[in-house]
Regions:
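Helix-loop-helix units of permease transmembrane domains in multi-pass membrane transporters
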Residues: 93-125, 302
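Long, hydrophobic alpha-helical segments
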Residues: 72-98, 102
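Secretory targeting signals
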Residues: 21-29, 122-184, 188, 201-216, ...
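Terminal transmembrane helical anchor/hairpin motif
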Residues: 26-66, 152, 198-301, 305-308
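Hydrophobic/aromatic residues in alpha-helical transmembrane segments
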Residues: 86-90, 134, 175, 294, ...
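Aromatic- and glycine-rich beta-strand/loop motifs that create alpha-glucan
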Residues: 1-21
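Short alpha-helical transmembrane interface motifs in multi-pass membrane proteins
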Residues: 71-75, 84-88, 157-161, 279, ...
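Selective transmembrane-helix segments that form parts of the transport pathway or gating/packing helices
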Residues: 10-14, 78-81, 113-140
Length: 309
């Protein structure tokens, strides 16, 4: 069965290796120049606190040069890439057998349908995990200089580093395997599996992820003009009747004095950097659990359903 499965999926394997090679080439070209600029601009010294007054300008110049390239290149495929990759691999696993009738040969041998599917799933799922881990490693290396400045929690870093990218691909793959079994067509199965995967992906990111752990709170009290006015906003207000308090001042008014008198300050809600792997583990666990449910359902349905006509 190993040789048969290799012959069936070697085209996908070669295509995935080609995709990985393309990502690696792009990463090497862009990241090499990024790393050179990072070192030549003296940013390691800035991060160590010994770069002097030139650091803000140097950091801004670096992010202006490479930040947009990093962000645009990955943001354009951030949401759909793992899902597309997973469904393209998963949908034909059973759907193609049912669509072209090759199940008649595959399932008439001495190997049971359940064992046939279990072996295919073990091999292909293992390949999916290896592919996801390899892409994650390449992108993590590629983004390393920018991550030292921005951290790992921004979306286009968080979603491609750590554990979640592999979990995203695995979940989409599992959905596509199940849907391919149900509707018996590869291309429609890709579409039908991708839509719920994307919906879950968005819900987890924007609804659940911010609440995996309660954020820490940092309050910056006004102690100087810099800390006070740095958080004060300017704008227009409509006519006000009655007493005007310290919350609104003329452009030439003593804003700092008013803020100090009112004991005002800035409150920051944040997730510390050392929670990155905790967040990654929670989110990856959600998608791996969904993948396990989908694959378990596919095995159960294939075992119980009658042979297709």
């Amino acid at each position: 069965m190993l040789w048969v499965n290799w012959r069936q999926h070697r085209g996908q394997a070669i295509a995935c290796l080609g995709l990985l090679a393309a990502i690696a080439i792009y990463a090497i070209v862009v990241s090499t120049s990024m790393r050179t600029a990072f070192s030549n601009d003296g940013l390691p010294a800035c991060l160590a606190g010994s770069g002097g007054t030139r650091c803000p300008t140097a950091i801004q110049a670096f992010t202006n040069e490479f930040g947009s390239e990093v962000n645009v290149a990955f943001w354009s495929v951030l949401l759909i890439f793992p899902g597309l990759l997973g469904v393209v691999i998963g949908a034909p696993l059973i759907g193609r057998e049912l669509e072209f009738g090759t199940w008649r040969l595959a399932w008439s041998q001495s190997v049971t349908r359940t064992r046939w599917l279990a072996v295919k799933l073990a091999l292909v799922t293992g390949g999916v995990i290896v592919l996801g881990a390899a892409i994650t490693a390449v992108i993590t290396w590629y983004r390393a200089p920018m991550d030292r400045l921005t951290g790992h929690f921004i979306n286009n870093a968080y979603d491609f580093e750590g554990l979640v990218l592999t979990a995203y691909i695995l979940c989409a793959f599992a959905f596509a395997v199940l849907v391919g079994l149900l509707i018996r067509r590869s291309i429609p199965a890709m579409i039908a599996a991708f839509v719920p995967w994307l919906a879950i992906r968005l819900v987890v990111e924007y609804v659940f992820r911010p609440h995996f752990l309660a954020p820490l709170v940092f309050v910056q009290r006004c102690s100087s003009p810099q800390t006070c006015m740095g958080g004060a906003g300017l704008g227009f207000i409509p006519p006000v009747t009655g007493h005007i308090g310290d919350w609104v001042l003329g452009m030439g008014g003593p804003g700092t004095v008013a803020l100090l008198r009112g004991h005002l300050g800035n409150t920051w809600l944040y997730q510390p950097a050392d929670r990155f792997w905790t967040f990654q583990s929670i989110e990856a666990g959600i998608f791996v659990a969904l993948a396990a449910i989908a694959l378990g359902a596919a095995i159960w349905l294939l075992h119980r359903r009658p042979r297709p006509a």
